[in-house]
Regions:
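Residue-level recognition of tetratricopeptide repeat
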Residues: 61, 95, 129, 163-165, ...
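Terminal, low-structured helical/coil segments at or just beyond the last alpha-helical repeat
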Residues: 32-53, 228-281
């Protein structure tokens, strides 16, 4: 497995995503975060975050449909989710979050044309919506449209009051890895780490980049942050630590990580590679 595939797998597993896109298991981000910012809110000053108490009855009914759609989406009941989206938009056509979720559903169904159209529609309705920018960028990245994805992540991370900045920087770094842009990936991941040093996906991917660059001592620092918690450690993170110690000619520590890998993730690809001594894969 190449580092590009391994880092993508790790980032999908580790990024906590809430709200609309929880079912994506990782890199997607909710544009709502409880923030219903479309027309229909009352009593809100410019620049305020709109909360549910600001909703009028029309928006509230649409939101209920949207929440149902999100639930069906997480259960992979995509046709039913789309039907709820249609009803939400029939109630309130200005609900950007519903259009965004429609894009995510079409993407999950493998309908790229409709997914992209929905993302474009959502951005035309709200060009600076950080969640939409992030999710559209990740969609493009997964389809190897790296040049188109990158500015969307930058724009998402730069939005004022954005709750997605660290995720957008992280996923931007992962996309840059997949594009072979290692120096740029290090910068994006380092910035994400500065903002959220507790995120294990950021630490793992940054360590992976540094390993690729041959900076093994620095790589060791970040991967230790991940493996220090048994709840965060994965077969991938323990294998990376094992490989780092092998490169540093530290067989005792290498074998300690290998033992953890064998005991906790027996039968995994990484455990098998350790048993075979294939540290360059």
């Amino acid at each position: 497995m190449t580092w590009r595939k391994a880092t993508a797998r790790m980032v999908w597993a580790c990024i906590a995503a809430g709200g609309l896109a929880a079912a994506l298991g990782g890199c997607a981000s909710s544009s709502s975060n409880g923030n219903w910012r479309q027309s229909g809110a009352q009593g809100v000053g410019k620049g305020d975050i709109v909360t549910q108490s600001d909703e009028n009855e029309v928006r509230k009914r649409a939101r209920i449909r949207l929440e149902l759609a999100s639930t069906y989406f997480t259960q992979a009941q995509y046709t039913t989710a789309l039907d709820e989206i249609k009803q939400a938009l029939a109630i309130d056509p200005t609900l950007v979050s519903a259009v965004e979720l429609r894009a995510l559903i079409y993407d999950a169904m493998g309908d790229q044309a409709r997914a992209e159209d929905a993302f474009k529609q959502a951005l035309s309705m709200e060009p600076n919506n950080a969640g939409v920018l992030h999710n559209y960028g990740w969609y493009l990245c997964r389809h190897k449209e790296f040049a188109r994805a990158d500015p969307l992540f930058v724009q998402a991370a730069n939005q004022p009051m954005s709750l997605t900045a660290t995720k957008s920087l992280l996923v931007r770094g992962v996309c840059q890895i997949q594009a072979g842009q290692w120096a740029e990936a290090e910068k994006s991941l380092a910035k994400s780490y500065e903002l959220d040093p507790a995120n294990p996906a950021t630490a793992y991917n940054l360590s992976a980049v540094l390993f690729h660059k041959g900076e093994f001592e620095r790589a060791r620092f970040y991967i230790r942050r991940v493996n220090a918690s048994s709840q965060q450690a994965t077969a991938e993170s323990l294998w990376l630590a094992t490989r780092i110690e092998h490169k540093l000619d530290n067989p005792t520590v290498r074998d300690e990580f290998g033992a953890q890998l064998r005991n906790r993730f027996a039968g995994s690809r990484e455990a098998n590679l350790f048993e075979l001594g294939r540290f360059d894969e």
